[in-house]
């Protein structure tokens, strides 16, 4: 199918969506007008006043008021804020030159502002008027992970895709459909919110009434708070209409995604566009994993990476050979999702297939380099540090900043202290010092059951006696002794956790120590405890170099 025919189909659907949007407001107006007509007709045709009129008036008011208030009178909060770090033309001439070139190649007006954001995202937004029909100031946001994780060619493709949305002839009507989705969704959400408030208010009234009844020895009422009244029914009614509107409007959005992909392939090249589409889901997963497992690992201990590394450290993760291989596999093994009629984006797998089916195209000259996209940003570490200041919570300013090796060690040491708390409490409650030597002394003195009974354990273990109790207690005591031993070694700087971008952090021990430690722990918690191997090992590790025998 030609681009012209595709554009005509999209324009037709956009016009249908605009018609449906108008129909939404006409439907609301028809409800109000119909109620007014019904009441007027009743008054005109009745020869006398009767109580049914009052009931109808009250019912009509109960229906018309929320429709008028929510659909026509409630103003949605306008979001005039633009989050992120401004990247000015003077500070970032290379990035601006690239953006201007791509916008020009797409045939659209470039942005008045570029902002750096923390998310795996890019987008062009416009301050429009009249539901998007009148253009305004244009903004571009670029996610820091895109600069860190994509090549220049892949970033060119992403930016060309975003500008491509504005190159379509029906972009203004599509703006109307987006505004329509927002307006209809806001109406339904407001009706549900008002219904929820009615339920909460009624529940509070019933609770107060029941408290009054109980204070006077009367039976509490079994009345429930209802479902939210007329607002809930109106929300359900408008939801039926919204489903039709969303189905049509999201179909428009999916068509525009394909059209924007074609713009990207023409400007940045077919292969770069397909590569970017494959890489984005993997990059999003990598960002989430990195933030959870690395950037925020020390937050509980009041620790953060050095300035610029909270977001910038993602590049270290992506540079690890094993992680890079994992991400490459994710890009090749895209999920075979079924299209959702209510989703604004087609499945990535289908978009990639469409792009890869296009004729080979290298893109425009001067674009499509395979250098890291972060090279387009001047002084990237400083910019990423400034982004942290904007994105992180205020309390982050009070946290201690460490380089990655120290951050990993100090974080794991804090976890080791936390893990050792149960056995430290057990020793203290038994009148002993909270040290590994004190626990070894207790084991030698035959107090293993006393210590074990004070450790957290299952109900079955707590009730066990005799041989069964010893079998339950042995792994408890071994874990407790291992926690104390690890804490002692790390606290005395005899062992250190090592950073790995490909694996979880591990306590660095010599081959000899790694072989002897498990055996020594097993011996110490055996039925006939032998603490000598562990005492000897700890003494050797603590002895200065050259003193060990």
What are these regions (language model features)?
Residues 50-80:
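Transmembrane alpha-helices and immediately adjacent membrane-cytoplasm interface residues
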Residues 37-62, 221-234:
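Hydrophobic alpha-helical transmembrane segments
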Residues 17-31:
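Select subsegments of transmembrane alpha-helices in polytopic membrane proteins
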